[in-house]
Amino acid sequence: MKIILLGAPGAGKGTQAQFIMNKFGIPQISTGDMFRAAIKEGTELGKQAKALMDEGKLVPDELTVALVKDRIAQPDCANGFLLDGFPRTIPQADALKDSGVKIDLVLEFDVADEVIVERMSGRRVHQPSGRTYHVVYNPPKVEGKDDVTGEDLIIRQDDKPETVLERLAIYHKQTKPLIAYYTAEAEAGNTRYERLDGTKPVEEVSAELAKILG
């Protein structure tokens, strides 16, 4: 099963990705991890990517797709894979298609912006341990304090409302057009497209996913 996950940051993709990986025994492929691994291993593609990144330049789509193709040719992807964070744009989706990679299923996690802002801006973190809380969904016993150590909790920069809104703006501009792209691909019979309501409780979304995935 070759799957693409679509959805804004904070839409719950990460949680459900774990569920799919455990159910099917397929790896999650993140382009960030791939670049880091290729650079660390010193592969030819890794060297090219590093040279561009060191100059502060964006890695071109052809190079990213070449890395993806390299990665999905590895033995652990024999039964499929889960692409998260790629493709991000229509040119990347076209490049993936042109390179002959067939996607079986595209999953969209649909969550309204205001819900995402509430979800992410309510997160609190105990930095030394990495323990996370949420002021609404998973509050600490004492407001602003870690349950175990009693130390202060912080709001990460990424979770501040203004940062969340910036990330959402980029998502809507760059990635949302992919929803129309893959809906059209599904109508043409090239893939399957399923939309999930990401505002439902995690267990309900997982149960829906289990049905979709059969």
From Swiss-Prot:
For this protein, the record's Pfam families field holds: ADK, ADK_lid
Group of enzyme by EC: transferase
Protein's GO biological process: AMP salvage
- Annotated ATP binding lies at 10-15, 123, 132-133, 200
Residue ranges the record marks as coiled coil: none
* Keyword Manganese recorded: no
- Please give the GO cellular component terms listed in this UniProt entry: cytoplasm
Q: Which residues bind AMP?
A: 31, 36, 57-59, 85-88, 92, 156, 167
The annotated pathway is: Purine metabolism; AMP biosynthesis via salvage pathway; AMP from ADP: step 1/1
Q: What does it catalyze? A: AMP + ATP = 2 ADP
Which residue intervals make up region (LID)? 122-159
Give the EC number(s) listed in the UniProt record: 2.7.4.3
Similarity section: Belongs to the adenylate kinase family.
How does this protein assemble?
Answer: Monomer.
Protein known as: Adenylate kinase
Q: Which organism is it from?
A: Actinobacillus pleuropneumoniae serotype 7 (strain AP76)
